[in-house]
């Protein structure tokens, strides 16, 4: 008597799709069981107090700790960062007040009135009954006149500083003053972090100093409108990686940020008061010769209440062609990328995002 064996087909792979390098068909398989690989299951908290130390050995040790996280996770909470909690609270308070204004008042700073698309933008999502507000964004950028280290610039270099075309509420000078104060504090922190990254990658800690005299900076006051937790579309910002050098995120206590690990699983970055979330961007991965990782992430607002966040995107001077760091190359590991002018790089990335990203110009421009 013969028997017939039943062949069970393996399950079809499941994937998470994300936006990167101008395309939306990037994917990562969701790995479970025997297919799972070692990866992070939480976002680490790093105490960066010693990056400000006068002792080089303490700065070096802190840089090694930061670099290890940037190589394995690409995301971290940072504490003891030196930015006043009172200022952070004031910025959030003003952001809430700004977004609570009538739409016609906010549209006085419509992004399309600015040649560099700085100002206010609103995003909608489809609902069974039509459209609803998904989120609102107020964007402003680096203005050299408000840098604690005011640079000497040629007219051509100044024109590359898109913040010279920032739009501000005319009848609310305190708003502008507070946001520029916040920008100044984060510029100090960003330059310190960049020295830490350089040291952690084996370079001189001042390696990047000459090319962040007039950096590309973009700051966005985000308001995610309340959503029905049962709604199909809960993405406040779809899966993507940041194309700048790095991001410092200031999030409220509602939560919603999720980080994609190597197994294709999203890990929540739950808010921790007194910290910022810092993540590696595509350009930093590029110039580190892929030693640092720019990790995919998304925002989902399933809370049913208003959510606010303030990402601060930081990159180098726009007119400099930045090469892969010599400290990240060797005879056996040559540079994988050609030097790239950041102005050209970001312009191309914006163009691709503008053409393909469903969430509009804010997500294209960062």
Task: Identify the residue ranges that each predicted region occupies.
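Peripheral, non-catalytic segments flanking oxidoreductase cores
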Residues: 1-366
